[in-house]
Amino acid sequence: MFKLGKSVDIKCDREELFRFHLNTNNITVISPPFPVVSDIKMSSNPLAKGSTVDLTVSFILFKMKWFLEVSEVLENSLVRDTQLRGPFKYWVHDHIFEEIPGGTRMTDEVRFIPPFGILGLLALP
């Protein structure tokens, strides 16, 4: 299993940033530019524990459906999404919100097993 993480300090109230992440209208704002995410369907707005997210992920040569579930929500602290079906053998993504002087530290942590066995390792950053 692999783990990637990245933190960013944002001059914003922790509760406000947490609510921003749960608002489904903001998914395109918080998604990276690659891979391209489209055909997004979410079961609720705002997201809550048990909400589902269905989307299409476009890589250079192919598209793939990805089904996620919001598996845990800790008020103003954590949003966890877990892959139900998609490109990875295993995928758990945590958005962690921590109050710091002057704002909020948001940390993204992803634990995953790449697809395609050893060939999947070629796709790692």
What positions do the PLM features span?
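Hydrophobic ligand-binding cavity/cleft-lining segments
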Residues: M1-A48
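Short beta-strand micro-motifs in enzyme catalytic cores
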Residues: F2, S51-V53, T104
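Short, surface-exposed coil-to-beta transition loops
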Residues: K3-G5, K63-F67, K89-H93
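Beta-strand elements of well-folded, non-transmembrane domains
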Residues: I10-C12, V57-L61, E72, P87, ...
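A short, structured loop/turn motif at beta-sheet edges
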Residues: R14, P46-L47, S71-L78, I96-R105
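Hydrophobic pocket/interface hotspot
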Residues: L17-H21, I27, V53-L55, V70, ...
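Glycine-rich portal/gate segments that line the openings of hydrophobic small-molecule binding cavities
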Residues: S38-R85
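Beta-strand/loop substructures that line and gate deep hydrophobic ligand-binding cavities in soluble
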Residues: T82-P125
